[in-house]
From Swiss-Prot:
Homodimer. It catalyses: O-phospho-L-serine + 2-oxoglutarate = 3-phosphooxypyruvate + L-glutamate; 4-(phosphooxy)-L-threonine + 2-oxoglutarate = (R)-3-hydroxy-2-oxo-4-phosphooxybutanoate + L-glutamate. Pyridoxal 5'-phosphate binds at residues 76-77, 102, 153, 173, 196, 238-239. NCBIfam families: PRK05355.1, serC_1. GO terms for cellular component: cytoplasm. Belongs to the class-V pyridoxal-phosphate-dependent aminotransferase family. SerC subfamily. Pathway: Amino-acid biosynthesis; L-serine biosynthesis; L-serine from 3-phospho-D-glycerate: step 2/3; Cofactor biosynthesis; pyridoxine 5'-phosphate biosynthesis; pyridoxine 5'-phosphate from D-erythrose 4-phosphate: step 3/5. GO terms for biological process: L-serine biosynthetic process; pyridoxine biosynthetic process. The modification N6-(pyridoxal phosphate)lysine is found at residue 197. This is Phosphoserine aminotransferase. The lineage of its organism: Bacteria, Pseudomonadati, Pseudomonadota, Gammaproteobacteria, Enterobacterales. Catalyzes the reversible conversion of 3-phosphohydroxypyruvate to phosphoserine and of 3-hydroxy-2-oxo-4-phosphonooxybutanoate to phosphohydroxythreonine. GO terms for molecular function: O-phospho-L-serine:2-oxoglutarate aminotransferase activity; pyridoxal phosphate binding.
Length: 361
């Protein structure tokens, strides 16, 4: 059987070791004779899953004690609404950094609840898209918070700086880069992330929120999106997505076994350098992102001859290189190389790219 590597942007591949363990435990979890999917979320057995997964996540990210960790429904799009409705308080304004598709999507949702001050930080030099340094961002004085997206999956654009905005409340959509490297949680008021890229399967959303920001929710905010309600109920205000929570907990344990986020940073950098090196080697492939802002997680690329795209994708699929088609907005190709993608998968892709170029260049 051909070795398959899944380059999907999300839902994305999970670590093989995690899938094997889940397979082994599926029908008889911890000797109960039932699946973890079938037990009550309030049972002592599942409460142990919840407690261990939060502890492991706190260890991985070094989350300070004055932050709550919430396991939620709704994906990042739900957080596009939850953030303003939880944080605006008496304000009607927030700074929104527009650096790409998902940042702009957050702006569109926020416009229902406030008047976002939109700050376009993209640059376009010599056909390459980049991001202004944070010190050049023109933040307003009275914004309730500053929202940005550190990694744009479609554009393949990353903001690698950590924010240093004094006492401003910083909110970040880390859906596609959480757990890929160490970050300083204390620089943020809220971090949120859909699970389906670097955490676990779709259906779970992670929120990390500083405690002093709780209790400011708009009266019209649905309780299921209220950070304080969720925190007060240990993320069990209603039935949570238990199987996704359990699998994410297995991923957290796998990350710790691999050496933590410092080790993942080294691996992710090596994978990205290998793939970008293959793209840059000749003019056959190209990436249109400034080097300083190239994403380690999502690598879009095009060919000089766009007519070859379909052939490239079909041949890649036949070689076990799946889900390389670019987003419908961007076209071309895109390789998403999250934590679970081994460097062997990237090597298989770059070998195929070189062979394809030899035959069609």
């Amino acid at each position: 059987m051909t070795q398959v590597y899944n380059f999907s942007a999300g839902p994305a591949m999970l670590p093989v070791e995690v899938l094997r363990r889940a397979e082994q435990e599926l029908r008889n979890w911890h000797g109960l004779g039932t699946s973890v999917m079938e037990i009550s979320h309030r049972s002592k057995e599942f409460m142990q899953v919840a407690e261990e997964s939060e502890k492991d996540l706190r260890d991985l990210l070094q989350i300070p004690a004055n932050y709550k960790v919430l396991f939620c429904h709704g994906g990042a799009r739900a957080q596009f609404a939850a953030v303003p409705l939880n944080l605006l308080g008496d304000s009607n304004s927030a700074d929104y950094i527009d650096g790409g598709y998902w940042a702009h999507s957050a702006v569109k949702e926020a416009q229902k609840y406030c008047t976002p001050h939109v700050i376009d930080v993209t640059t376009h030099d010599n056909g390459l898209t980049g991001i202004q340094p944070m010190k050049q961002w023109k933040l307003s004085d009275n914004a309730a918070y500053v929202h940005y997206c550190p990694n744009e999956t479609i554009d393949g654009v990353a903001i690698n700086e950590q924010p240093d905005f004094g006492n401003k409340v910083v909110v970040a959509d880390y859906s596609s880069s959480i757990l890929s490297r160490p970050i300083d949680i204390s620089r943020y008021g809220v971090i949120y992330a859909g699970a389906q890229k670097n955490i676990g399967p779709a259906g779970l959303t992670l929120v990390i929120v500083r405690e002093d920001l709780l209790g400011k929710a708009h009266t019209a905010l649905p309780s299921i999106l209220d950070y304080k309600v969720l925190a007060d109920n240990d993320s069990m205000f209603n039935t949570p997505p238990t199987f996704a929570w359990y699998l994410s907990g297995l991923v957290f344990k796998w990350l710790k076994e691999q050496g933590g986020l410092g080790e993942m940073e080294k691996r992710n950098q090596a994978k990205a350098e290998l793939l970008y090196g293959a793209i840059d080697r000749t003019g056959f492939y190209r990436n249109q992102v400034a080097i300083a802002n190239r994403s380690w997680m999502n690598v879009p690329f095009q060919m000089a001859e766009a007519s070859l795209d379909k052939l490239f994708l079909s041949e890649a699929e036949a070689q076990g290189l799946q889900a390389l088609k670019g987003h419908r907005v961007a076209g071309g190709m895109r390789a998403s190389i999250y934590n679970a993608m081994p460097i062997e998968g990237v090597k298989a892709l770059t070998d195929f790219m070189a062979d394809f170029e030899r035959r069609h260049g």
